[in-house]
């Protein structure tokens, strides 16, 4: 498992005093209220201020005090240590932990490995890459078991839930 988790990406500057506009990459963007620090380019940096504007976070970090300094950080990812992550509910997983898991069905057919998780308003979708790409809706009647120790996800056979043209 990864020790660091990505929580956002700096997408622009905000104002002249080093504040930055951040695209949150976490389900609950209000989690920034509780961060004492973030990891920026491998270094721990204290969070001095957090504001919200529409669907973005305005972040002020210690040591970044001008628009010029903030400008250099555009497109940089913000990370936190796993121990500072929010506590997950049962049957919830961080995307970074699901990526690379092998997906098989109850008949033993191997579809491939999870390349990414697509988040949609109704449910997540596993993007599985093997001999061909398959999109697997993350629904209780399709995804039957997730074994993180073995990095193995068991689903119902695709013929039972996937329709072909």
Swiss-Prot record:
The keyword Glycosyltransferase does not apply. Gene3D superfamilies: PRC-barrel domain (2.30.30.240), RimM (2.40.30.60). Its main location: cytoplasm. It is found in: Cytoplasm. One of its GO terms (molecular function) is ribosome binding. GO terms for cellular component: cytoplasm; ribosome. Residues 90-161 form the PRC barrel domain. One of its GO terms (biological process) is rRNA processing. SUPFAM superfamilies: PRC-barrel domain, Translation proteins. Keywords: Chaperone, Cytoplasm, Ribosome biogenesis, rRNA processing. The PRC barrel domain binds ribosomal protein uS19. An accessory protein needed during the final step in the assembly of 30S ribosomal subunit, possibly for assembly of the head region. Essential for efficient processing of 16S rRNA. May be needed both before and after RbfA during the maturation of 16S rRNA. It has affinity for free ribosomal 30S subunits but not for 70S ribosomes. Belongs to the RimM family. Binds ribosomal protein uS19. This is Ribosome maturation factor RimM.
């Amino acid at each position: 498992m990864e020790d660091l988790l990505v929580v956002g990406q700096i997408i622009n500057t905000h104002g002249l005093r080093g504040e930055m506009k951040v695209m949150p990459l976490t389900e609950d963007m209000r989690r920034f209220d509780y961060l004492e620090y973030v990891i920026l380019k491998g270094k721990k940096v204290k969070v001095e201020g957090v504001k919200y504007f529409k669907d973005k976070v305005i972040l002020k970090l210690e040591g970044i005090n001008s628009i010029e300094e903030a400008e250099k950080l555009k497109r940089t990812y913000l990370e936190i240590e796993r121990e500072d992550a929010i506590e997950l509910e049962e049957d919830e997983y961080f995307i970074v932990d699901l990526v690379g898991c092998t997906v098989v069905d109850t008949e033993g057919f191997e579809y491939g490995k999870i390349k990414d998780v697509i988040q949609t308003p109704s449910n997540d979708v596993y993007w599985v890459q093997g001999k061909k790409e398959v999109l697997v809706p993350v629904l209780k009647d399709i995804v039957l078991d997730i074994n993180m120790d073995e990095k193995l996800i068991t689903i119902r056979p695709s013929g039972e839930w996937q329709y072909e043209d």
